[in-house]
A protein has these predicted regions:
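Glycine/tyrosine- and acidic-biased, solvent-exposed loop/turn segments at the edges of beta-strands
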Residues: 1-171
Length: 171
């Protein structure tokens, strides 16, 4: 198969479009909801593997997810959203490098309040990490170095707001 294939719903609206070269998915791939106007999924393939940015939408047209690939491997940002069109905010925004967790990772509660900010380096916990409670108050904070807790960690008491500290030394 060497061509762009399009399929249709019974109502005449486009269902999906896919490009093939030498029998493999290569190029644009788009899938629509039955109404035919709102996309469900849009991305590219390279030799049957997801490539570049892939975007997903909900039936109401709201963008729900963006994922970046390099020849089938997570590479770059991956973002997911909560909510409806009137109150849309991120669920998470994370990063990959050649399939490994890398860089800033940020999660939010459904309310939009921060849940976790963290850092990775080549797939390992490395750098500053902060957790929050659903009410927006910090829960704990510290550093990782090559997957291990490092330095002073601060943990806050639920009710009094009083913090205590714990030192993690290199082993």
């Amino acid at each position: 198969r060497d061509s762009t294939w399009t399929t249709w719903y019974k109502n005449g609206n486009k269902k999906f479009l896919a490009t093939y070269i030498n029998g493999k998915l290569n190029g644009k791939y788009i899938r629509w909801y039955e109404g035919g106007i709102i996309k469900e999924l849009d991305g590219d393939y390279l030799n049957n593997k997801k490539h570049n940015k892939w975007v997903s939408w909900a039936k109401n047209g709201q963008k729900t997810e963006e994922i970046n690939y390099d020849n089938g491997v997570h590479h770059g940002s991956h973002i997911n959203w909560y909510g409806d069109k009137n109150d849309q905010h991120k669920s998470f925004h994370v990063n990959y490098k050649n399939g490994a967790k890398d860089g800033d990772w940020h999660y939010w509660y459904a309310s939009g309040v921060d849940s976790l900010k963290s850092n990775y380096l080549d797939g390992e916990k490395d750098g500053h990490w902060v957790w929050w409670r659903k009410n927006g108050l910090k829960d704990k904070e510290g550093f990782y170095k090559k997957e291990k807790k490092h330095g002073v960690w601060t943990i806050w008491n639920d009710s009094s707001g009083i913090a205590y500290h714990k030192l993690h030394e290199e082993t």
